[in-house]
């Protein structure tokens, strides 16, 4: 990226997020990561490295109890709530998802392209989450996709890359609503089933339901069964399979339709759910 384009991007980031809405990493190479910095937060999908956070992926991983593998020595620039995003040796941005064998995903060819993508995402998220206007939400989704391709024509070449996963997550509720149900036991042993239906917006039905129950004073140990219409996800910004397994280790989990770990499996799960809904409606 040229110096002029760097300056234009820096001005756009400051104009949109404000100085306090950006976090710089002074040890980073020259560019947006050092000045003016990346957004502190963009919806559920990105949160910049905190001022007191470990700077290497390996340090962060060790503190969290997992092995970062080949990414251990790299500069950690933020998180999506489950994957750690980092500055790679070839100056690209990548994301590592912890697990038995860490999954390493392409994100962007450089920090500038990533910052432009985050700027687009933050501008368009409110419209994409406009549950009362599905036409507006779909138009904003398409604008985001085209904008990302304009920034990086190869953004969607790898369907398992980070940006394709973000867009899959945004598209899911635009295609079809899905639901979740928790069975909750009270202090007297009485049971009740509580449900939530998802739709356009930034929270999955599991997240909405747990937020609601926590606000009512329900504790995690009271959740004994979890049913999700779509298999709990491992998608950027959510990682429902992971947080629910952590929150409800005692619960029995079932789901109606596989969602899986690949783009193909996710697409097949959505199609199966849509077909089931159409059949029920006659």
PLM features: residue spans?
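Intrinsically disordered, low-complexity regulatory segments enriched in Ser/Thr/Pro
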Residues: 88-105
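A short, sequence-level motif marking secondary-structure junctions
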Residues: 90-92, 112, 197-203
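Compact, glycine/acidic-enriched structural inserts
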Residues: 101-130
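A surface-exposed partner-binding patch
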Residues: 1-86
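N-terminal accessory interaction module
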Residues: 75-77, 114, 233
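Structured loops at beta-to-helix junctions and adjacent beta-edge loops in soluble globular domains
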Residues: 78-80, 96-98, 185
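Short acidic-glycine loop/turn motifs at beta-strand connectors
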Residues: 81, 87-91, 184-191
């Amino acid at each position: 990226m040229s110096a002029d384009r760097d300056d234009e991007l820096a001005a756009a980031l400051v104009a949109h997020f404000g100085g306090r809405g950006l976090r710089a990493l002074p040890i980073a190479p020259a560019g947006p990561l050092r000045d003016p910095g990346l957004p502190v937060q963009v919806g559920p999908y990105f949160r910049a490295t905190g001022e007191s956070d470990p700077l290497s992926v390996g340090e962060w991983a060790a503190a969290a109890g997992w092995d970062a593998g080949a990414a251990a020595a790299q500069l950690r620039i933020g998180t999506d709530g489950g994957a750690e995003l980092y500055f790679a040796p070839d100056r690209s941005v990548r994301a590592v998802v912890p697990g038995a064998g860490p999954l390493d995903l392409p994100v962007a060819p450089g920090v500038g392209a990533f910052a432009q993508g985050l700027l687009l995402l933050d501008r368009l998220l409110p419209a994409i989450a406009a549950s009362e206007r599905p036409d507006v939400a779909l138009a904003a989704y398409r604008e985001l996709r085209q904008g990302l391709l304009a920034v990086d024509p190869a953004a969607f070449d790898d369907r398992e890359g980070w940006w394709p996963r973000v867009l899959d997550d945004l598209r899911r509720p635009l295609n079809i609503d899905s639901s979740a149900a928790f069975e909750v036991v009270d202090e007297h042993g009485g049971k009740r089933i509580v449900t939530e239906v998802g739709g356009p917006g930034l929270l999955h039905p599991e997240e909405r339901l747990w937020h609601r129950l926590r606000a009512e004073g329900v504790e995690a140990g009271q959740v004994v069964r979890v049913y999700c219409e779509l298999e709990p996800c491992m998608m950027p910004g959510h990682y429902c399979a992971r947080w629910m397994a952590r929150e409800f280790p005692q619960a029995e989990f079932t789901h109606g339709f596989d969602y899986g770990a690949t783009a193909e499996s996710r697409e097949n799960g959505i199609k199966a759910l849509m077909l089931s809904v159409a059949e029920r409606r006659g």
